[in-house]
């Protein structure tokens, strides 16, 4: 690779790692030409510094000021609010117990979940659904009611019960197509559309249901109830099964308030609970902001993205419930380290430096730091100390040494980063399969999920760790692959412009001589297919339910964060609005 010097040599400082100030510009060499990557610049007899070519990503600056983050607070930690929530929970619990009709029970359970307060009633909801699943006469009660049948199917599948796709055969004609008369039942069509996203591989009836309902819901005309119309538009933008739970709760609270059959006590509980949990988030993000400032990595490595608030948003998406505060704090730290190290590999480090850093992480030994340049020493030590501290807390609380598993996940990540760096520096375009076999690891999903596991699962054993994270369970692969493809769909063009390895879209185009439009459609189809695989794992995997939920939620968060562009690397209006709604701005309560 040829290097082009753009300035007069002057005294060089290894600590000057500011963005937008590349020392040299990279120019790809002609095919077969040898790359010359390093230039020694001597400004005086006392100062001799090896100059290495640096790329610039032109990332947007951090939009969340430290002092503003530290000032976040609310009144919803007051005892009067907490006392009121406990009273409302008892009222809603009584409502659950008194609901007797099958459809009434299903609608109440669905509403409680969508409002974000289902975690308060896990025991009651499990008992209701268990009873519903074992009652032989239930099919007869909702036979012919598409809305009720689809709601029954979706809720039971969401909670791990086996419900065959054949329950929808009664809504199909002799040619195995859905009856045209169903198009008049908008509520039923919407319910079937949402249910179709719980499909497993090979369930062609549900594939047909999705295509049929999507086609007709898209073409709705005439006078439709405004609330129902809003629900349809919301579902067509992104189905409920793919949505981030806490963001969905915030949206649905506003929607539910406008419904004629709204339960005011349930609505009040949802609003109060949202604000109280938001207060928990504010305390956490203040703590994490202080940790990040004290770590000093953002100030020292000015080329890297500073995305603390966006990183914290990811953790809410993965586990929003207040009892998983430790998991969110661990993942916030991990997200910051991932973002920084990703920028070291993608933007700042030379290939030689990246080889050394990968070896250091693989060895997990501070002695390996000796060969690293100064900025990498800082980065490695921040990683080493943070991960070891997480492992120490786990050892102290559970008596299990998790360092080998955490270290392995980081070593695998850095090795995957290095593969992509080698591809970039050699100008190599991998096949799509070759790319994806590496890319589901390089997107850092396994690192996130391994750390999520050790920070939220009680009674960890070495055997369970080995089964779960030692070889990366398939549910981790599916979640990570959705994360990768969603990222590629949003960021591949920008990443190629700043200099990066071809992504899945470009690999498909190169391998199949296809247009970008076709390649993007293929990646979206892959995401849909992978969701079916993950649905199966959620139902059948013996892994702890909180961990399976975290894996699913990571995929949901990916599709949210990259739905309108790169909501992490270059935060857009939507990601800012998500942070404001979940962390900053409480829901206004009605005056009593």
UniProtKB/Swiss-Prot annotation:
Its EC number is 4.2.3.111, 4.2.3.112. The keyword Chloroplast applies. It holds the Pfam family Terpene_synth. It is found in: Plastid, Chloroplast. Binds 3 Mg(2+) or Mn(2+) ions per subunit. A motif (DDXXD motif) lies at residues 342-346. One of its GO terms (biological process) is monoterpene biosynthetic process. Mg(2+) 1 binds at residues 342, 346. This is Alpha-terpineol synthase, chloroplastic. It comes from Magnolia grandiflora (Southern magnolia).
